[in-house]
């Protein structure tokens, strides 16, 4: 397997972060409401992983190194895993294992609906992130996986609705996300390899 060391580093890093958070919760180091802190951190971790996933293609075009693409799918699947953990923590710590509370939560916090829409889209990408699905779907596979851009928008909207007045951190993620989208515009994406060539010549 090519770039096994890079894949291993991603695996260990993505696994270590939630494990550390759980340990912090165990020793009561997450403040007065550790459950909510876990929910928030897992959601933010999923957004960071989504941004990292989207950054792999521009990085490959700029550097010419295929290792970035080698871990792109892995990062995307870890993003989905973090979202699953985010939802699980929400069910345990916010709903108290009571689905009956979900209706009340939805009426008070409609941003949950936005988050669920993002989860459904991400689920579709996760179950089709394999060669079998690529062969079966053919040209439709790429069209389906463009949902990642919608997922980013939903994720940022979900976070914006959650943080409300505290916009400083959200703005940082929004700027990074918007920059990654700009790098995918055909007129800009075509120039990225040229930048690498010019840098190599100079």
From Swiss-Prot:
Membrane topology: Multi-pass membrane protein
Bound cofactor: record note: Binds 1 FMN per subunit. Binds 1 heme b (iron(II)-protoporphyrin IX) group per subunit.
CC per GO annotation: plasma membrane
Organism superkingdom: Bacteria
Location within or outside the cell: Cell inner membrane
NCBIfam families: PRK05419.1-2
Name of this chain's protein: Protein-methionine-sulfoxide reductase heme-binding subunit MsrQ
Source organism of the structure: Pseudomonas aeruginosa (strain ATCC 15692 / DSM 22644 / CIP 104116 / JCM 14847 / LMG 12228 / 1C / PRS 101 / PAO1)
